[in-house]
Amino acid sequence: MKKTISIWAPLRYANVGDDMQAIAFATYIKKLGYNVKLFQLDEELSNLYDLKSVRTVDELCKDVNLVIIAGGALLTPFRWYKRILNKAAREYEADFKDLYLATKKYPSVKFCAISMGGDGKVKKPETWYSHWRIDFFRSESFINGTVRLSGDVEQMKQAFGKNFAYHADMLFRTPEYFEYDLLPKTDKIRVCLQFKKGRYLDKKLLSDIYKYAEDNDDIEFHFITTHMPKIGLTYQYVPNKQSKNIFIDTYKSPRQLLGVLASCDVTITSMLHVGLMGLTVNTPFVSYRGPGKTKSFLKSIGGEWAILPENISFNELREQILIQNKEDLYKQYNQDIISEMIEDSKNQYEFCKTIVEKYS
């Protein structure tokens, strides 16, 4: 009889990065000969990738010895007031309460985070995390795992007393686990745009994009989101309607969104995992008002040129990035470093195999 491995991630938010990490590990573990069940994977994705999904932590922990924590930005810091006032932050910390209580109810079950995300900086846990998150990470049931930013090794050691290893992000192996459907061919330049609302978006830049798309016919602008629309998270910008050169490509599945990214000549995003997904299908990305970790990653691959000025104009963006050849842009990164990261990311999967064989 096959043993079963469980995979936990915050999948109810239907975020493409979390979905892909959980699905990739599930696919890998199934190929090793195990059954797999995932926590709250979207029903359509469950059917598409033939993966079992369960709704509760109890169902996840029953009849297993190991729960893989498949990423998500588990070290995301929240100020105390955000943990009270922000619904998503409250729910996220409540997840850790459920996980911690599960360590008490199922003492034989081990929890292991693989390719876990933070911002690479050491933070005082009591300032940034709920006591449930702290208690879970410090519990004996939560065993040593891996992180995807080297700075988080020290965070896990200092804050939680855990010895984590660093390897490059497991999503570097995306093409091995996900097929995708390309958009119809076109002679136009295709630009993928992922914008956050509010202070993360320059209204003048947006207005100029619309004007250019209306007055010219050489560039298509594809606006993407990283959450499925049915989840109701609306912090990312999408147009009200499509037009001849304005397209709305909200996230439906990894297959669909990877196809959009692969079909574009460049991705403009604030999110590291969106840019990384694009890189794996040979689409260069530039950071627009992105956080420190996105900029740090670009610097690490020789991509200082890809960190856009905060108030870049559309004309500057067009001349410096949009009309440049796709292959030439990609070659501006340090190819040797990217190749090393792709190779090192294999170790995330090898670590997964070792843990599964040891604790299943």
Named regions from a protein language model:
Residues 1-360:
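Active-site anion-handling motifs in enzyme catalytic cores
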